[in-house]
Amino acid sequence: MDHEILNSYSRLNHLNVSRETFSDFENYISMIIEKNNKINLISEKTASKKAIIERHIIDSAQIIDFIDLKSNTTTDLGSGAGMPGIIVAIILKNMKNNMNVNLYEKSYHKSSFLKEVSEKLKLNTKVFQKNIFEIKDLETGTIMSRAFKPMPVVLDLVYENFFKFKNIIFFMGKSGKNVFENSKKKWVLEYTEKKSLTNEDSFLVNIKKIKKKL
């Protein structure tokens, strides 16, 4: 892999990511670009290789420190093109961690793409072409929510549909502070925050416990 490509991933150096993992990232990016010409996996604004690395790969990979690595599964809500779920699965493969990454995506074409990527890169994933709002009694370790639904909707979903989980990771954008503060009016949350690597106005929220306010 050339020096320029490795430099693109420099913000992930602290994760000690191997060259094999970078190679998996590169193959994944190629598959996204090729498939995006046929179906709308990601926005055209972020569909260049440089944008995919900076806006999607790095953004998704930065949550690995929040993943409960002792759990049997982690779950990506509304996985879309696979970010963060596929990215996390690639890193777990590099770590030789056999955790299952559950990818929920109701779109036939996107779920087919997720299966194709998982097979080609030999990832430990399970793809569910289902609407997660219709599934009850779910159990998992970490729940990941990136560009899925607003925080209040996801909190309600987790409260109603998951009987057991370790933590929920939210990717929050520019308006995230207001959304987060409004959510705390309805919920008692045990959480930590972390500044995003990709945007100074963005941040991550790692919620370990949720409880509805009376």
Language-model region placement:
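Class I SAM-dependent transferase core
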Residues: D2-L69, T75, Y108-S112, E116-L123
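Conserved SAM/SAH cofactor-binding pocket of Class I
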Residues: A61-T140
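Short glycine-centered segments of the SAM/dcSAM-binding site in methyltransferase folds
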Residues: T73, T142, K166-I169
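Short, polar loop motifs at secondary-structure junctions
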Residues: N131-F133, G173-K177
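Short SAM/SAH-binding signature in class I
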Residues: T140-A147
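A short glycine-rich, Lys/Arg-flanked "PGG" loop and its adjoining helix->strand segment in the class I
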Residues: L155-I168
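Active-site capping/gating segments
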Residues: S175-L214
